[in-house]
């Protein structure tokens, strides 16, 4: 299987590359700056989305602002990627936004919903950009899946996770980046949650 990963140089992106490599995938890794990698199954690229997605079986988008105050770019970049996918006939798309993005009160505990409401007000531009990103994905005609994790950690893989459109997250919910990466690669293979927003957290 061949996948294209946008945001491959970030902390989650690196875990995606590792998970894809472990599954024997070949990868086109897209980043803002050209990177190098000794792994022959990974080809790094920058710039044009069209050349990056060409020939891919699935496209994974895991980029995001480094801080909530960064200039919003997620919706615009995603729109360009979706356009390139249509042009090249690529139909499988997976993306990470976040558990605080959008209007999902049934997936949040009361306290987490209060926090999400405050975050959406405090970082309005960034959160509206993420919501627009989700809207673009959901209104597209491709086979999409959106992953909505709570707090991401850099710890070791916990192994067991809970994932699905009805999962609830709370103030203590978290997931290791390695586990989220493994879940995304598994979904790219199996297509269990096509056309759904998937909340995901560690099962502990």
PLM regions: where:
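Substrate-positioning beta->alpha
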Residues: 73, 147, 173-185
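Conserved Rossmann-fold cofactor-binding substructure of NAD(P)-dependent oxidoreductases
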Residues: 40-57
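N-terminal Rossmann-fold cofactor-binding loop
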Residues: 30-34, 46
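N-terminal Rossmann NAD(P)H-binding glycine-rich loop of SDR-like oxidoreductase domains
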Residues: 1-23
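Glycine/proline-rich active-site loop of Rossmann-fold NAD(P)-dependent oxidoreductases
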Residues: 156-161, 187-196
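NAD(P)-cofactor binding segment of oxidoreductase domains
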Residues: 66-95, 132
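Conserved beta-loop-beta element that borders a ligand/cofactor-binding pocket
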Residues: 134-156
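NAD(P)H-binding Rossmann-fold N-terminus in SDR/SDR-like oxidoreductases
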Residues: 11, 15, 68, 153
């Amino acid at each position: 299987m061949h996948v294209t990963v946008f945001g491959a140089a970030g902390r989650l992106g690196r875990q995606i590359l590792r998970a894809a490599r472990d599954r024997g995938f070949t990868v086109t890794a897209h980043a803002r700056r050209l990177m190098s990698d000794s792994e022959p199954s990974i080809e790094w690229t920058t710039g044009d989305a069209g050349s990056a997605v060409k020939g891919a079986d699935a496209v994974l988008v895991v980029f995001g602002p480094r801080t909530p105050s960064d200039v919003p770019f997620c919706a615009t970049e995603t729109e360009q990627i979706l356009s390139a996918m249509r042009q090249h006939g690529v139909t499988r798309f997976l993306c990470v936004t976040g558990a605080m993005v959008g209007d999902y009160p049934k997936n949040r505990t009361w306290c987490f919903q209060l926090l999400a409401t405050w975050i959406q007000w405090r970082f309005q531009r960034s959160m509206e950009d993420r919501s627009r990103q989700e809207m673009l994905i959901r209104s597209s005609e491709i086979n999409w899946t959106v992953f909505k994790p709570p707090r991401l950690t850099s710890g070791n893989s916990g192994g067991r996770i809970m994932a699905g459109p009805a999962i609830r997250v709370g103030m203590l919910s978290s997931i290791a980046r390695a586990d989220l990466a493994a879940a995304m690669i598994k979904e790219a293979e199996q297509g269990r949650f096509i056309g759904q927003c998937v909340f995901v957290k560690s099962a502990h």
